[in-house]
């Protein structure tokens, strides 16, 4: 069953803007290993801080580096577990209940007795005044609801960006675990995004959620009250765009931005379609690029030569053996 939400013009606009931003980031993110690790640590710190973990970013960094830190043992263990979960989860299948439970086991081992298992009793979410603000699904329905959600997510053809927000929201509403639901919802959205664009493995979306956590919780509550996640989806897409643009500011030194921006919009879309093949293979031929983009051979050849002239691609070989490869961004 399709979860209740509407696809709005605002969502589609944000989806286009995010796609354009991450196309540039995909070209850059592997270049800076230090920045990648720093962003993962920021993600872990922020996701735990949202759940009231009081350790500072500096303390979290030290714990992950294996150093001794003064702090509550439970909070230190949360950091260690989260780091292990983030290191492993991007190998997982986002539509597998077994993998969801395995990730929860990594996230909560040594912290809760029900680690790696769906809850078997009712649970409520309370605000600071002790008022119940949300009641999770009855325990006997949890497995079926998660199963239905994952089956829908696997089959749907809506954009991955929107789908990831829907899954995040629905997991929070189902509240399948006794503890760790918020961390798992955010982690699972990251996994879905990374399966679409690997750069999302390193974009610290949680840092922006932490920054806007009041609105985050308000829109979860609105979606719960209205039984419709539309406003939450729009909010999360804004967060993802802000995170992508923030990350981009730290990677502009790679030199891709200026070169890609010199392409016309139709040429940028052409490049976005052939980029995965360029990245994961030994290059691309004119024929293959034409097949992937639906362009004619002559148009494809012209676009490829434009990319060569901008030092984005390099032409290798002659005549029938000619193919195109990505230039090493580190040289520019």
Show where each model-derived region lies.
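FIC/Doc superfamily catalytic core
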Residues: 1-332
């Amino acid at each position: 069953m399709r979860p209740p939400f509407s696809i709005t013009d605002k969502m589609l606009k944000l989806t286009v803007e995010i796609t354009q931003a991450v196309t540039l980031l995909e070209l850059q993110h592997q270049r800076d290993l230090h920045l990648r690790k720093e962003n993962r640590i920021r993600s872990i710190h922020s996701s735990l801080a949202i759940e009231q973990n009081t350790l500072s970013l500096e303390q979290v960094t030290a714990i992950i580096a294996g150093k001794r830190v003064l702090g509550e043992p439970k909070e230190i263990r949360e950091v260690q577990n989260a780091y292990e979960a983030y290191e492993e989860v991007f190998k997982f299948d986002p539509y597998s209940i077994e993998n969801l439970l395995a990730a929860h086991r990594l996230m909560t081992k040594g912290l809760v007795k029900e680690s790696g298992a769906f809850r078997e009793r009712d649970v409520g979410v309370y605000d600071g005044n002790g008022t119940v603000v949300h009641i999770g699904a009855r325990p006997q329905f949890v497995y079926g609801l998660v199963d239905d959600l994952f089956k829908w997510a696997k089959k749907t053809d809506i954009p991955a960006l929107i789908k990831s927000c829907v899954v995040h929201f629905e997991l929070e509403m189902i509240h399948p675990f006794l503890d760790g639901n918020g961390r798992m919802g955010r982690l699972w959205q990251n996994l879905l995004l990374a399966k679409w664009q690997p750069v999302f493995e390193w974009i610290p979306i949680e840092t922006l959620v932490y920054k806007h956590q009041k609105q985050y919780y308000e829109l979860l509550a609105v979606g719960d009250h209205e039984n419709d996640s539309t406003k939450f989806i729009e909010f999360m897409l804004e967060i993802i765009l802000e995170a992508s643009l923030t990350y981009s500011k730290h990677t502009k030194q790679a030199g891709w931005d200026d070169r890609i921006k010199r392409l016309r919009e139709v040429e940028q879309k052409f490049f976005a379609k052939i980029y995965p093949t360029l990245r994961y293979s030994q290059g691309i031929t004119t024929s293959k690029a034409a097949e992937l983009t639906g362009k004619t051979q002559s148009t494809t050849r012209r676009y490829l030569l434009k990319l060569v002239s901008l030092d984005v691609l390099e032409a290798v070989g002659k005549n029938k053996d000619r193919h195109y490869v990505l230039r090493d961004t580190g040289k520019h």
